């Protein structure tokens, strides 16, 4: 349906490689439906843990997981995996999600926006390079962490050269 009628396609958190696969699949389906595949924009869920050192960020991640409400996460896992049985492939989008992935309910940890400002900016640029237009970020301490993200990460992202392939007249990305 997204390929036929949607302006935006939002993905759960995932690796750069899997995001690229989803984007390519949706664009191919859009073209098969007679749409310009570049009319569809792509959003990605991500959970940000920005710290001065990688180990500090990963310690925060371990703390979040250790303090998770296990009953709630297991209940969510059971429900979404059961719901996945109703999909065409009989799995659903959370089939490969671990307990740790589901602590941040839309697989936000899978984006790996966890580390130093430089690491996070580089990850965001990698997602942009495969066609992600927007990263929907979650934060542990929303006000403080969002402010920190805006001050320390966004300027780095803006300073990085865009890696997004330019569309051609036919709407296809230029290949190297």
How should each PLM-predicted stretch be described?
Residues 7-11, 40-47, 135-138:
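Hydrophobic faces of well-ordered beta-strands that scaffold small-molecule active sites
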Residues 14-129, 158-176:
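An alpha-helical appendage that flanks or caps ligand/catalytic pockets
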Residues 13-18, 134-150:
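Glycine-rich, proline-tolerant flexible connector loops at the mouths of alpha/beta enzymes
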